[in-house]
């Protein structure tokens, strides 16, 4: 059986001598079978080099401990480096799984891309143990097109400017619970915004005729025998009520007093 080392799968980064001397194949054969071994190593090397997160050299000057209670403090610390703000990382004193103690100890004693490689291996081993696909590229996303056709051009609202159905509804502003939100549609072709269509108010002749016919029947069954309301009296003259006063000019003679 050919020996497989981390250095044989890394073309850009050179691993340390301690990890390079470790037979990774023999270590992984304790957890997974040979059928999944090659794919797991290849996947771990690809993802660790692609999604490698650079570890920051934390010192006392840029490290601040968490202010949580002791029972809730899981040992998270973050770096206040100006280039990498709030870069969270876990401290190595967190209790690890005893089943993978050998691999966990190797992760604690390494750094850089080799540490990321071992972490991906540990994740893949746990997924294989549970019968779950570890490679996210092979997981098929669920398609809900049969249930929701909101963004389907067949059902979209046509644009009044260019008559295209390549439109998207957007909620511009949310209001109170008893008020409708402000919704606008955006056309991707002509880059115009327009209001959503409204329902037109129309009369249903069948319902109106039926309601009138029903009212006639009710009138015939229960006739209105109440007396008619009295006629409204004529409004009083404002002059008689004294609301309007007779005015005269100063040059005119004063009005005669009534005897």
Curated annotation (Swiss-Prot):
Subcellular location: Virion; Host cytoplasm
Record: residues binding Zn(2+): 159, 162, 187, 190
GO cellular component: DNA-directed RNA polymerase complex; host cell cytoplasm; virion component
Gene3D superfamilies: 2.20.25.10
Induction / repression: Expressed in the early phase of the viral replicative cycle.
Single GO biological process annotation from the record: DNA-templated transcription
EC top class, as a word: transferase
Chain intervals for the UniProt region annotation (Disordered): 220-259
Transmembrane segments: none
Skewed-composition ranges (Pro residues): 226-236
Zinc finger extent (TFIIS-type): 155-195
Function recorded in the entry: Part of the DNA-dependent RNA polymerase which catalyzes the transcription of viral DNA into RNA using the four ribonucleoside triphosphates as substrates. Responsible for the transcription of early, intermediate and late genes. DNA-dependent RNA polymerase associates with the early transcription factor (ETF), itself composed of OPG118 and OPG134, thereby allowing the early genes transcription. Late transcription, and probably also intermediate transcription, require newly synthesized RNA polymerase.
Assembly and oligomerization: The DNA-dependent RNA polymerase (vRNAP) consists of eight subunits encoded by early viral genes and termed according to their apparent molecular masses Rpo147, Rpo132, Rpo35, Rpo30, Rpo22, Rpo19, Rpo18, and Rpo7. The same holoenzyme, with the addition of the transcription-specificity factor RAP94, is used for early gene expression.
Family: Belongs to the poxviridae DNA-directed RNA polymerase 30 kDa subunit family.
Protein name in UniProt: DNA-directed RNA polymerase 30 kDa polypeptide
């Amino acid at each position: 059986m050919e020996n497989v080392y981390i250095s044989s799968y890394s073309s850009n980064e050179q691993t340390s001598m301690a990890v390079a001397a470790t037979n990774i194949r023999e270590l992984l054969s304790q957890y997974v079978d040979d059928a999944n071994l090659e794919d797991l190593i290849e996947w771990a090397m690809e993802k660790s080099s692609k999604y490698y997160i650079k570890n920051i050299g934390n010192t006392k000057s840029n490290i601040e401990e968490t202010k949580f209670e002791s029972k809730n403090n899981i040992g998270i610390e973050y770096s206040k480096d100006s280039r990498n703000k709030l870069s969270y990382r876990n401290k190595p004193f967190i209790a690890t799984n005893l089943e993978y103690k050998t691999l966990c100890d190797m992760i604690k004693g390494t750094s850089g891309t080799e540490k990321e490689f071992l972490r991906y291996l540990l994740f893949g081993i746990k997924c294989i143990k549970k019968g779950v696909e570890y490679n996210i590229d092979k997981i098929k996303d669920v398609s809900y097109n049969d249930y929701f056709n909101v963004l389907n051009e067949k059902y979209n609202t046509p644009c009044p400017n260019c008559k295209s159905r390549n439109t998207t509804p957007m909620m511009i502003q949310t209001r109170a619970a008893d008020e409708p939100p402000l919704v606008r549609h955006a056309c991707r072709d002509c880059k115009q915004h327009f209001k959503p269509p409204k329902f037109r108010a129309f009369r249903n002749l069948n319902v109106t005729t039926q309601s009138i016919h029903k009212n006639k029947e009710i009138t015939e069954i229960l006739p209105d025998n109440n007396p008619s309301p009295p006629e409204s009296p004529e409004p009083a003259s404002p002059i008689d009520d004294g609301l309007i006063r007779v005015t005269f000019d100063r040059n005119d003679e004063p009005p005669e007093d009534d005897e």
